[in-house]
Curated annotation (Swiss-Prot):
Its EC number is 3.4.21.97. The active site is at 55 (charge relay system), 123 (charge relay system), 142 (charge relay system). It comes from the Viruses. Residues 336-355 are annotated as: Interaction with pAP. This is Capsid scaffolding protein. It is an enzyme of class 3 (hydrolase). The lineage of its organism: Viruses, Duplodnaviria, Heunggongvirae, Peploviricota, Herviviricetes. Residues 452-462, 471-480 have a biased composition (Basic and acidic residues). It comes from Equine herpesvirus 1 (strain Ab4p). The keyword Secreted does not apply. The record marks 242-243, 622-623 as: Cleavage. GO terms for biological process: nuclear capsid assembly; proteolysis; viral release from host cell. Transmembrane segments: none annotated. HAMAP family: HSV_SCAF (MF_04008).
Amino acid sequence: MDAYTVDGNAVSLPIYVAGYIALYDMGDGGELTLTRETVAAALPPASRLPINIDHRNGCVVGEVLSIVDDARGPFFLGIINCPQLGAVLATAAGPDFFGELSEGLSEQERLLYLVSNYLPSASLSSRRLGPDEEPDETLFAHVSLCVIGRRVGTIVTYDATPENAVAPFKRLSPSSREELLITAREAQSRLGDAATWHLSEDTLTRVLLSTAVNNMLLRNRWNLVARRRREAGIEGHTYLQASASFGITNGCNKADFCGAELVDTCGYKSGEKVHGAPYSRVTLGAKAFTSSSPNALPSSDNDKGGIGERTQKHISAMASSNPQTLSAAGAPLVSGDYILVPAAQYNQLVVGQHTSHPPINAGPAPVTHAVPSQYIPPAYNSLMPPSMYQAPPYWSVPHSANLEAQITALVGALAADRKATKGSDPHVIQGSQCSPPLSPQQERRYARKRRHDWDATTRDDLEGIYYPGERSPRPGERRAGRPSTTIADLMGAVSSLQQEVSQLRAIQTVTAQPQAAPAGLYKPIPAVPPQYSQYQYIQPQHAVSAIVAPQLPGIPSQPTQAVLAPQVPAGEAPGSAKVVAASTAPQQAEQARAAPQQFEAVTSAAVLPVTQPQASSQTVDASASTGLEFGRDDADIFVSQMMSAR
């Protein structure tokens, strides 16, 4: 239902939801683009905006209290009070979902954990404008809770109070935050504290199930959620936990704030102020450390987990035996401090470290590294005795490299941090019982090594099709389709026909080329009578090629007869040539009259329709491109043509 109802007997569990419904200039294209002018024209909305689930108009669970136009994008704050929502989610959750906190959590806190991890995003529904229509106060239709919103940065936070719901958004301007809270209090006073939105459990169950089904194929859901959280600037949200294993706390105590990425310095949960910490406080194990100074080191309690032991072991291993080599100002360093050495300057530092020592070949080699006399080449003519033979540089005694030892310890500490922060490692999970968040020093340190995944990839890569168990497709890569047998057969037939046509054209070209021999080159054989000697050499230019028509099945092929013109032998009288020409003229005329009749008969036979097989009603008719056999064989036709031509 769209309107709220007041029911004093219902179990009221009001919670508040807040977040950006869009971000300006973040790559949203098409109809998803919201400009500052459009949002300014649409605010304030003409009517109250409902909050539903998965854009279902019949599944309204709350209402938007306030929307402000922040510098980064429109930001909303709403209230959710649907008793059936908490009941359905609590029934669906397993007994181990809340872990050790199951005994001490209230019903409202259970609802916050469930809805935060099931519906972490919001989606704004706006009215589609016409070609010449301008936006107005009726542009916004409703706000929907969903798994992943299509717009950038549309991750929401849920909490028990409006102030706590807005607190994790660190990039929200103070003026927008104050205006949002004031407007929300006024709207809530008009609604009343007992405002609830009732739904049937069957309807709510179907909607929640459809939300899960429609997002089953979403690739890297929690990676995408984490990316959207960074885009929205959320820090310190307790209830949204992308845990790699089952359970909210993953074996940690409630006081550890396990799962909170960054806790605000003012401690919006406890109200305690951490002095001297201008940025944030990060939990590690059971003890929080501040990032007030860039040289401050994170301290950990070694009794609370394996992460503190490994971190303390690697940090203590980096203590320098020669602190003066690391101090630029000459002041001694505190035990346990370390520095980051860029890879580009590593070689220069190593060379500078070696130049402070005497040259390797300044004196004779030590006795332990002297080369025995039997290993010296016999033809070696040295100006000094064999005992004074200088050893190569790599045979000298290695000196102590304090800088290299410290860099090695630093690399070991970085490797241990990466292993400790990798939540998917079962050994780390068993040893530490929870995966602590990254400190600001660690974030800056990792940022120098590589870019974040959400910066290196585009949004289109995350929204593409993927297949479980296979590698993710690269940008611009397309899955190759299965080759069609019919298309392959057709391509083979076309290639064969092209080859046949090329061969036929080559034969005609060779036959049509004139090849004349010099007069008197070929003389008649003496054993042959003179009247037959004219056939010993036939010049190709006097041969008439017969037209070879395609032979169809059922039509007998007739041998091709070439009409040969007689050749006049060299030295013979012109009168005899006239007699031979006169005797062959009637034969040429008779064959010339017979050739058109034969060609017309073959041509008329070629245009006769080929009988097609009748389709049977009991079988499935294949398409014409499948290449079914119709009683003709192209190979036989080709062979008959070639044999008749020969």
